[in-house]
């Protein structure tokens, strides 16, 4: 079970990340996400896509680190490539893509949001790229997209130091376009 859902409401599609407790990415969910993006690209009637996390604490905490526990370099490479393919497909989506960040958006969670056209964060959200703290680097275009949005100074702080930012600071630095109250 991939624990990722695609639903349609009129001309809007919703992808919900639902992998408790933290809505993490697995290889299977990345592959399912890519297939959903292929399906969405075949639907010209879909003009908008909202990506959201199930629950109220996590938008997406990034990769499920259990995938890397055995130290298999080939598997890590396969996962990194899957991240890249999935989020590049999102970045190329023909409609408007919106990340509805309802909680923690870490690592691959922030990277999926960065691939969206618009990012809206609830006020309790916390955003970051903590990969460096576990010996990794963002692998899905996040380094480039983050730098484009916030400039090299903030990008380096977040990428190299793993600095996390609140929704308010993310708005002030241009990482998100709007901050809303919880549940909106």
Where are these regions (language model features)?
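Conserved CoA-thioester-binding segment of acyl-CoA-metabolizing enzymes
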Residues: 1-52, 88
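Glycine-rich phosphate-binding loop at the start of an alpha helix
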Residues: 62, 80, 84, 107, ...
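Short glycine-rich anion-binding loops that position phosphate/pyrophosphate groups of nucleotides
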Residues: 20, 55-57, 103-104
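Glycine- (often His-adjacent) and acidic-residue-rich active-site loop
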Residues: 53-88, 135
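Hydrophobic/aromatic residues within transmembrane alpha-helices
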Residues: 15, 51, 64, 112-114, ...
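Amphipathic alpha-helical segments at domain termini/boundaries
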Residues: 1-17, 163-184
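CoA-thioester-processing core
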Residues: 86, 90, 100, 106-159, ...
